[in-house]
């Protein structure tokens, strides 16, 4: 099995359903023998450019280990989910379990308050 980093940009009107959406994808990954090494919710952020006249979106990131068949199944689900504006799947050499830069910056901002 290979390691992947998946980043999703979700429509801001669907932010309340992010939890159930992630549970659905976790079930797909775990049912087929995959593993989730890290899952992060980056929250709402400004987009660099508007997508479908939307200027803010909800960002999610997962590091998973799965086979190509499961990855194709996930990608199919991402494409036909209207709530997902964009998805990015990057192949990685190994599992990454450390917090991402986005989460480290978020924790620093909370510490300053």
Swiss-Prot record:
Any single GO CC term annotated in Swiss-Prot or TrEMBL for this entry: cytosolic small ribosomal subunit
Signal peptide: none
Keywords noted in UniProt: Ribonucleoprotein, Ribosomal protein, RNA-binding, rRNA-binding
GO biological process: translation
Keyword Ribonucleoprotein recorded: yes
Superkingdom classification of source: Bacteria
One Pfam family, short name: Ribosomal_S6
NCBIfam families: S6
Entry similarity comment: Belongs to the bacterial ribosomal protein bS6 family.
Function: Binds together with bS18 to 16S ribosomal RNA.
Official protein name in the record: Small ribosomal subunit protein bS6
Encoding gene (name): rpsF
